[in-house]
Amino acid sequence: MKFSTALSVALFALAKMVIADSEEFGLVSIRSGSDLQYLSVYSDNGTLKLGSGSGSFEATITDDGKLKFDDDKYAVVNEDGSFKEGSESDAATGFSIKDGHLNYKSSSGFYAIKDGSSYIFSSKQSDDATGVAIRPTSKSGSVAADFSPSDSSSSSSASASSASASSSTKHSSSIESVETSTTVETSSASSPTASVISQITDGQIQAPNTVYEQTENAGAKAAVGMGAGALAVAAAYLL
């Protein structure tokens, strides 16, 4: 069992190491036929906005579903649904990339709220909000690959659990095999010696002088056999 537990812990640690963040990507808004098409996400005194100004972000999605920017800050959701920059401890979780779009809480719908010459970036709809999609664009200009941290974690955990269960099963099987072998050997060693009565060629019955019986404490005791004369009489009677 100690071996099985150690192996399980090692596999779980390895699985955590294998899980990685997404590739780095830019955040580009998509709203065909409007001035919201191809705007970038940037920070205005900590508030995340959509605009065409400089200072746009590159971002990654961490292995626990947080949106991390290239200034080492994270996307945080305010009570009204708008996004701001903040620390990892306050970061929102639930980000992923699916079908070429940034998702939050399994939804690809985001909203832009007019604020002067730019737009406040939000996760909630309001009367003055316009729906947009966010395309994660890699440094090469292509759409970033799909990334789902929850699926990656589940798969790795399941692999580790499966390997741990397999190891535990093998260990138990080995113990059972040893126990079975020991039981068989013990039974063979404690089996009583059976006395066989045989018939000789002239038709008389011949029995050994000593019969061994198994006692309750697995010891053998000898019982004195019948005398030769009594045996002959019994044989004649039977014939």
From Swiss-Prot:
Residues under site feature: Covalent attachment to cell wall glycan: Q204
Protein's organism: Saccharomyces cerevisiae (strain ATCC 204508 / S288c) (Baker's yeast)
Induction (record text): Positively regulated by cell integrity signaling through MPK1 in response to cell wall perturbation. Induction is dependent on transcription factor RLM1. Down-regulated during anaerobic growth. Up-regulated by low pH.
Post-translational modification: Extensively O-glycosylated. The GPI-anchor is attached to the protein in the endoplasmic reticulum and serves to target the protein to the cell surface. There, the glucosamine-inositol phospholipid moiety is cleaved off and the GPI-modified mannoprotein is covalently attached via its lipidless GPI glycan remnant to the 1,6-beta-glucan of the outer cell wall layer.
Signal peptide start-end: 1-20
Compartments where found: Secreted, Cell wall; Membrane
Record's protein name: Cell wall protein CWP1
Gene: CWP1
Primary location class: secreted
Stretches the record annotates as Disordered: 131-196
